[in-house]
Amino acid sequence: MEHKEVVLLLLLFLKSGQGEPLDDYVNAQGASLFSVTKKQLGAGSREECAAKCEEDKEFTCRAFQYHSKEQQCVIMAENKKSSIIIRMRDVVLFEK
């Protein structure tokens, strides 16, 4: 095998192991988390919201909720183990 082919196969292998942004989260439709430490951000998709959660440097993001109608993302330091869950329409809660 030529050097170029080996490099190409290696890059394809590394790319395939990354997975989807939401794979690291468990989701609950219609659940909202009461959180003290949070940020509200605009996001066009759940995946974009997950990326914002992963990239945040101000606190450790343990959960996020996505409001599809408003295209709003709320990233939070708390999760269901440390906070209260309330029922809410048109929202999906994602937790690590």
From Swiss-Prot:
Gene3D superfamilies with a match to the protein in the record: Hepatocyte Growth Factor (3.50.4.10)
Where in the sequence is the signal peptide annotated?
1-19
Under the heading SUPFAM superfamilies, the entry gives: Hairpin loop containing domain-like
CC annotations in GO: extracellular region
Q: Which SMART domains match?
A: PAN_AP
Please list the tissues where expression of this protein has been recorded: Expressed in liver.
Q: What intrachain disulfides are recorded?
A: C49-C73, C53-C61
Q: Which Pfam families match?
A: PAN_1
Keywords on this record?
Answer: Disulfide bond, Secreted, Signal
The keyword Secreted appears for this protein:
yes
UniProt entry tagged with the keyword Disulfide bond: yes
Q: Where is the PAN domain?
A: 20-96
Where is it located?
Secreted
- InterPro entries, per the entry: Pan_app, Plasminogen-rel
Function recorded in the entry: May bind non-covalently to lysine binding sites present in the kringle structures of plasminogen. This may interfere with the binding of fibrin or alpha-2-antiplasmin to plasminogen and may result in the localization of activity at sites necessary for extracellular matrix destruction.
Protein name, entry field: Plasminogen-like protein A
Organism in which the protein naturally occurs: Homo sapiens
